[in-house]
Amino acid sequence: MATHVSAVDDIVSEYQGLEAQLADPDLHNDAARARKVGKRFSELQPIIQTNDRLNAVTDDLEAAEEMAHEDQEFAAEAERLREEKEELSDKLADLLAPRDPHDGDDIVMEVKSGAGGEEAALFAGELVRMYQRYADKHGFAIDVLDDAPTDLGGIKDITMSIRSKKPSRDGAWSVFKFEGGVHRVQRVPVTESQGRIQTSAAGVLVYPEPDEIEDVEIDDKDIRVDVYRSSGKGGQGVNTTDSAVRITHLPTGLIVTCQKERSQIQNKARAMQVLAARLQQMKEEEAEAAASADRAAQVRTMDRSERIRTYNFPENRISDHRINYKAHNLDQVLDGDLDDLFSALQSAERAERLEAE
């Protein structure tokens, strides 16, 4: 408990400092710094609010216990306050527990169809719609940076930016990070005339997005920028100039494309953001692997080459193989109802982090 008190005191001091900065008009002349301060303020706010409520309940409980000897109504009130105090103490401990430093971050997500041809592309499209529906329900905004649709409405590959609509302690990374890996589907494809169940797959890659490109060192001589004409199905939204951008990072071979913005400058800026996110992720994973070479699995990330989840349509079943999670509500999950699954994954990650401390 003493450790919690010390930690909260430090957070209260930091929170008050951030509050003073946000009240300073000069801060808002520097948009990047203002975003960072606002983001950190939002991350600390739930801790401050929970701690304030816990202190108030503790004071009320002491008063109620003193009066309980004379009035039975206060005895009942004291019992209620004891329960609330215990709940708040548990909540505060959870808020103070070790957490992923990127949990408040926006993300870049890539979804790619795997083995299975057109059926795999259709499944990749369903995964994208599942994420879009979840995002709509939970205050996230999705921007498509680049995509390659198929004739039947599937997706060969797509790159998206997923952002919180307002600063939050729990950003897009806090939930979508669990999606990195191979997703397998079992069902009768629409193209299958014999009614046989087939298996196909789609791969998902997720990267936390740096607050600023400048946070990641990218040397101009290490990149090659190519421009080309944007593709599309026609209409006013299609660019008629060479505005699409492809950036190749020469040392790593990473290639990033963006064609959804209205100008070449905007497409290059967004492509650089995606490249920065991918390079940051590579650097962190290399450092983490070196620091935890004696462990079979990393704490923060799952192996992106492994099969993490199976979507079984005949049984309406979804299975997450990392935590032995099974549920027969696949139809609801594909409609964006991922709350139970994400909650189970977050609990497992939290337990693993506490064990590693």
From Swiss-Prot:
Localization, UniProt: Cytoplasm
Sites bearing N5-methylglutamine, chain numbering: Q236
Keywords: Cytoplasm, Methylation, Protein biosynthesis
Pfam families cross-referenced by the UniProt entry: PCRF (PF03462), RF-1 (PF00472)
PTM statement from Swiss-Prot or TrEMBL: Methylated by PrmC. Methylation increases the termination efficiency of RF1.
Record has tRNA-binding as a keyword: no
GO molecular function: translation release factor activity, codon specific
UniProt cross-references to InterPro entries, sorted A to Z: PCRF, Pep_chain_release_fac_I, Pep_chain_release_fac_I_sf, Prokaryotic/Mito_RF, RF-1
Gene Ontology CC: one annotated term: cytoplasm
Purpose: Peptide chain release factor 1 directs the termination of translation in response to the peptide chain termination codons UAG and UAA.
Family that this chain belongs to: Belongs to the prokaryotic/mitochondrial release factor family.
Protein name: Peptide chain release factor 1
Organism: Corynebacterium kroppenstedtii (strain DSM 44385 / JCM 11950 / CIP 105744 / CCUG 35717)
Gene that this polypeptide is encoded by: prfA
